């Protein structure tokens, strides 16, 4: 209703012969234009109308030199090492760090080796809590029999200058498999945070979205992880954001799998 009132008429100076807005008398000019009147309820003019304020499209004209809550870096997987400083709020995306020669090469090789490691699948692969996907049981002796896994971990160590403290082999058998939003243990266990300040994940197989959820306002963002892609997150990202793997909607279901190799460890960060 307030937008139908001619603000220029209220001000006493509308010059349009056929104005498309209403020229209404007895409106309180101060209340209409400023949403306040010093006379309050005693004002003899009408307080039923006030102009709608348009939000400003720019609110801060001072440069802000703070680093963002999340800073995303895109890195070259063809390089021998990551060539930038790593910051506590970094997420680093690396394309084809393992330089695989054809699609699904590492996916197929990893599955072949872990199936041939000598441990029955029902003993080796355990459901992650929540029963959302499978992980290889680290308590069993399989890693030395999966040389491609050790090759990948070594590449992670060398590329990021990382001291790897623990690892994981995840298997998402189809697009129904997913991982809920969560923090890695270093976010809330000081004894782990002493030697783990960075998570590195490399994906093989079908493209899936990794996503982050900000603690304060639940804002989310997602980053597609293609075959061979790496994403990392540093100390503050793990504390301030949860992360997970989104489930694909049922109508887009595919019986295609994804493997992710995770390394947790320590990297010098600014």
Residues covered by each model-derived region:
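Cys/His Zn-binding finger modules involved in RNA regulation
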Residues: 1-69
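Non-heme Fe(II) oxygenase metal-center motifs and adjacent flexible, charged/small-residue loops
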Residues: 54-270
């Amino acid at each position: 209703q307030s937008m139908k009132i001619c603000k220029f008429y209220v001000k006493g100076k509308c010059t349009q012969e056929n104005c498309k807005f209403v020229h209404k008398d007895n409106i309180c000019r101060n209340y209409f234009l400023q949403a306040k009147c010093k006379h309050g309820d005693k004002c003899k003019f009408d307080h039923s109308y006030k102009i709608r304020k348009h939000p400003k499209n720019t609110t801060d004209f001072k440069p802000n030199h703070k680093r963002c809550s999340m800073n995303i870096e895109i890195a070259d997987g063809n390089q021998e090492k990551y060539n930038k400083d790593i910051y506590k709020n970094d997420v680093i995306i690396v394309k084809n760090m393992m330089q695989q020669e054809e699609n699904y090469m590492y996916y197929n090789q990893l599955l072949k080796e872990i199936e041939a490691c000598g441990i029955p699948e029902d003993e080796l692969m355990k459901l992650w809590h929540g029963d959302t996907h499978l992980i290889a049981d680290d308590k069993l002796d399989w890693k030395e029999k999966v040389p491609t896994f050790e090759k990948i971990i070594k590449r992670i160590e060398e590329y990021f200058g990382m001291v790897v403290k623990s690892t994981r082999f995840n298997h998402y058998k189809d697009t129904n498999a997913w991982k809920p939003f969560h923090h890695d243990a270093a976010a809330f266990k000081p004894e782990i945070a002493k030697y783990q300040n960075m998570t590195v994940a490399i994906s093989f197989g079908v493209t899936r979205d990794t996503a982050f959820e900000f603690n304060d306002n639940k804002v989310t963002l997602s980053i597609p992880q293609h075959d061979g892609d790496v994403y990392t997150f540093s100390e503050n990202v793990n504390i301030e954001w949860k992360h997970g793997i989104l489930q694909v909607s049922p109508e887009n279901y595919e019986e295609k799998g994804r493997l992710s190799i995770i390394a947790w460890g320590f990297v010098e960060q600014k």
